[in-house]
């Protein structure tokens, strides 16, 4: 496969941007080789600058659930852009998307739009502290909530990909109030509450972990967190930046039947444009300025382009049969991946929920980040390179979830499974 143009562009980028990229995982540090530079995307496919075509299972890291450049989303954006790219003022489209989010997500009675998942998580942390008058927060090892200082503690893929424990430049004082527990370990959470009476503002987690690979909550875990937070006067926050509108129209909280106090969102709700949001109970959201004293603002928040793309994407997702199709597509893919690995004599643990999936090259089960680290990362790197040669683009990290879309056809899935068969055989 010829990637000479990708190599030349990435080579030039080294002198222009740190590591030659705008986000670390794109540099292929954990899988080896040089990154592929894309030229265009459409449906389930991506084409690089050398003309190579790939079946894409990253989907812009989650937003492209309807497929890249969906014609209805593009048409809506073309109409909207004629009116301007950003107003810096209230926009009627904000009301429309807000109503759709509130209607869909069980916990959300009011919502504030921002520009990224990181922004949403930064704001929600400030909000739970403002509302409770407490400073400490519990997060889970391997859960990633953006690159804000206070969350860069055992933060999963963002740092695992680079082999860093945390990040230089984060003062100890900043993370002194960030407590961590192993995912799926209620006893550890109980111990933290016991050790910090009336000091914990809230618990934040990915209801399905997508930044330490793909890890599902064990039965009773989310329910137990809901009970513990209520018992101790703390707030429960679901980071649904990844799972929101992806595993069901109402997100993970609708899928599992557990309603948090607050929810952060992003990715899908922007239809491929930069967006984030946080929302929840009206009495808590009433703390946010200008309604209340907790300050948070953003120049491009609620801009008409992101709102337009989000509205059209949610309209597409609300159509009957959407999530049944996504589930069937992903289940077929994961079954094929498992069979391909086992046929090659390799250990594998693989699972999916709706349009989100993942696999570890180790014996399961994988219930937390510590167990996830047992995956054979070196072999995954070889597998990743082999899959590229077969025209399949996977996340360039063993600690990232994968994503399917409505655009992936049965033929795409069959081609992908065949690529896995040949690639597993080559790296076994």
From Swiss-Prot:
- Lineage, top-rank taxon, reads Bacteria
One Gene Ontology term of the biological-process aspect is: protoporphyrinogen IX biosynthetic process
Residues recorded as bearing N6-(pyridoxal phosphate)lysine in the entry = 267
Gene Ontology cellular-component annotations: cytoplasm
Reactions catalysed, semicolon-separated, are: (S)-4-amino-5-oxopentanoate = 5-aminolevulinate
Task: Please give the pathway this protein is involved in.
Answer: Porphyrin-containing compound metabolism; protoporphyrin-IX biosynthesis; 5-aminolevulinate from L-glutamyl-tRNA(Glu): step 2/2; Porphyrin-containing compound metabolism; chlorophyll biosynthesis
Cite the entry's keywords alphabetically: Chlorophyll biosynthesis, Cytoplasm, Isomerase, Porphyrin biosynthesis, Pyridoxal phosphate
UniProt subcellular location: Cytoplasm
Q: What EC number(s) does its UniProt record assign?
A: 5.4.3.8
Its needed co-factors are: pyridoxal 5'-phosphate
InterPro entries cross-referenced by the UniProt entry: 4pyrrol_synth_GluAld_NH2Trfase, Aminotrans_3, Aminotrans_3_PPA_site, PyrdxlP-dep_Trfase, PyrdxlP-dep_Trfase_major, PyrdxlP-dep_Trfase_small
Q: List the disulfide bonds.
A: none
One MF term in the entry's GO annotations:
transaminase activity
Which Gene3D superfamilies has this protein been placed in? Aspartate Aminotransferase, domain 1 (3.90.1150.10), Type I PLP-dependent aspartate aminotransferase-like (Major domain) (3.40.640.10)
| UniProt keyword annotation of Flavoprotein present | no
Stored SUPFAM superfamilies: PLP-dependent transferases
Could you say which enzyme class this protein belongs to?
isomerase
> What NCBIfam families does this protein's entry cite?
hemL (TIGR00713), PRK00062.1 (NF000818)
Give the quaternary structure: Homodimer.
Q: HAMAP family in the record, alphabetically?
A: HemL_aminotrans_3 (MF_00375)
Family recorded in the similarity comment: Belongs to the class-III pyridoxal-phosphate-dependent aminotransferase family. HemL subfamily.
Query: Would you tell me the protein name for this molecule?
Result: Glutamate-1-semialdehyde 2,1-aminomutase
Species assigned in the record: Synechococcus sp. (strain CC9605)
Gene (UniProt): hemL
